[in-house]
């Protein structure tokens, strides 16, 4: 893991911090996500609160935060892992983002490692994600972690010219999430 960074799950009570970090990610890299800062800024606070509250008890979600291990505990990145609603043996990774000041320090790799450990712990057989085709650093990270291209690139959202490459990683266990 990156020195000076710890990876943990968001607590349900941390929805304001999750909201702030998510909106920061959308503003920093608007081309990398299927949503936009404008859309999510309009969400009612109750929706943000409910999202993390549901994730904390579902057993099918793992919202992760990377934070400085020092006294400031500044949040430096996030990644959400979630069981596919139609196939409990598949975990999808989304909302991956690392703050510019923390990039190149192993934070993204640590977030992915934690998400993969969670996926293995719930007996998932496959992990899927989509990565913007122009984000070569992220693509190389996922390839180093064992992901492979899993289909043809497609628009990241309807009407977008930006393409997203689907990727997948087979896990050794072959049972469904409980």
Question: Model segments located where?
Answer:
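Alpha-helical macromolecular-interaction surfaces
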Residues: 17, 106, 110, 114, ...
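Short coil/turn segments at alpha/beta junctions that flank glycine-rich nucleotide-binding fingerprints
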Residues: 105, 121-125
């Amino acid at each position: 893991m990156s020195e000076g960074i710890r990876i943990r799950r968001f607590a349900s009570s941390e929805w304001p911090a999750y909201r702030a970090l998510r909106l920061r990610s959308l503003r920093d890299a608007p081309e990398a996500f299927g949503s936009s800062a404008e859309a999510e800024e309009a969400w009612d606070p109750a929706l943000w609160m409910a999202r993390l509250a549901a994730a904390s008890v579902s057993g099918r979600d793992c919202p992760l935060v990377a934070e400085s291990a020092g006294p400031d505990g500044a949040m430096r990145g996030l990644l959400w892992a979630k069981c596919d609603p139609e196939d409990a043996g598949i975990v999808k990774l989304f909302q991956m983002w690392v703050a510019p000041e923390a990039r190149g320090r192993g934070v993204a790799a640590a977030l992915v490692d934690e998400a993969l450990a969670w996926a293995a712990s719930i007996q998932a057989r496959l992990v899927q994600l989509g990565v913007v085709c122009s984000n070569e650093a992220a693509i190389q990270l996922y390839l180093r972690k064992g992901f492979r291209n899993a289909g043809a690139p497609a628009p990241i959202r309807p009407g977008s010219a930006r393409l997203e490459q689907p990727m997948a990683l087979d896990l050794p266990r072959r049972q469904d999430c409980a």
